[in-house]
Amino acid sequence: MTMRNALQQLEQEAISAISSSENLKDLEDVRIRFMGKKGSITQQYGLMKTCPPEDKKELGQWLNQLKEAYNQSFEAQLEKLKKDELHARLLSERLDISLPGRHTHTGGIHPVTRAIEEIAQVFAGMGFEVASGPEIESDWHNFGALNIPDDHPAREMHDTFYIADDPNGGRRVLRTHTSPVQIRVMENRQPPLRVIAPGKVYRCDSDVTHTPMFHQVEGFMVDKGVHFGQLKGLLESFLQTFFEQKLPVRFRPSFFPFTEPSAEVDMACLFCNGKGCRICKGTGWLEVLGCGMIHPEVMKNVGMDSEIYAGFAFGMGVERLGMLKYGINDLRTFFENDVRFLSRHAVY
């Protein structure tokens, strides 16, 4: 058999093997058999070393024709097998688009966040903006500027979390209320001001109605001619809007170092309609917030003239209002991450 005939026979053998491949694995085996490092076609190129010089050109042409025929057949079969494999996979993965979609489980808005958003929304409708401040406060912003004297009980260690002193001087605390935001805003801006400041506050207390960390909303308004009647109307409107019902509201004289005059605000008990029950301790009233006209000394501390400007301030516990509106009995459940509680009270 001549060299030419041997190469033609090898070509037919390779093409036949390629055509007989039923899957990509079979085709890969054929490639290794003929074109691998020790493959039948690969070994034919070794003939060039022993071939007489005058025959090398012709032998080279035959080998190139063999390789080209092999490659054309191999690529065509490879493309065909890939298409066949894709088609088979698509058939096996075919979806029934008439089936209902899978339910996606989503988280909900925590009742504290929900209450803050609802409170902020009500006050936004009254022209108030939202401000924030640091939770680690200076003694001055948390107490001194708010006219809270050095001997006031609120400054005691059993009520306040004191932390490392400020390197620049002065004591630092975890803020006990969001009123320091009022001081910071009034120090840096001029009236007219309408601001609420929701945020976390910290006190050394823990029982059914108290936790060491809770949320508070401080609000204040400063302008010329501000009076207590405006404060009263504002808070009555807020409570009726937030609780979505017209409730009797009363203002009781009280005392806060940073307001004068000061008042505690009560509303008729939601659970007994003012008739008296366990929740309101038989009084028919529920205490919901404190308020008053900003004390002249506080105005002085922030550089405002109390002869020109007047203002009022109010503060409320977010969890307290949330407990009343959403019917929650224990303040501590807000922070225990009980999925059953969150599923019942979260908004999705």
UniProtKB/Swiss-Prot annotation:
Mg(2+) binds at E260. Binds 2 magnesium ions per tetramer. GO terms for molecular function: ATP binding; magnesium ion binding; phenylalanine-tRNA ligase activity; tRNA binding. It catalyses: tRNA(Phe) + L-phenylalanine + ATP = L-phenylalanyl-tRNA(Phe) + AMP + diphosphate + H(+). One of its GO terms (biological process) is phenylalanyl-tRNA aminoacylation. Signal peptide: none annotated. Its EC number is 6.1.1.20. Its cofactor is Mg(2+). It is found in: Cytoplasm. Its main location: cytoplasm. Keywords: Aminoacyl-tRNA synthetase, ATP-binding, Cytoplasm, Ligase, Magnesium, Metal-binding, Nucleotide-binding, Protein biosynthesis. It comes from the Bacteria. One of its GO terms (cellular component) is cytoplasm. Pfam families: Phe_tRNA-synt_N, tRNA-synt_2d. CDD domains: PheRS_alpha_core (cd00496). Tetramer of two alpha and two beta subunits. Belongs to the class-II aminoacyl-tRNA synthetase family. Phe-tRNA synthetase alpha subunit type 1 subfamily. NCBIfam families: pheS. This is Phenylalanine--tRNA ligase alpha subunit. It comes from Magnetococcus marinus (strain ATCC BAA-1437 / JCM 17883 / MC-1). The gene is pheS.
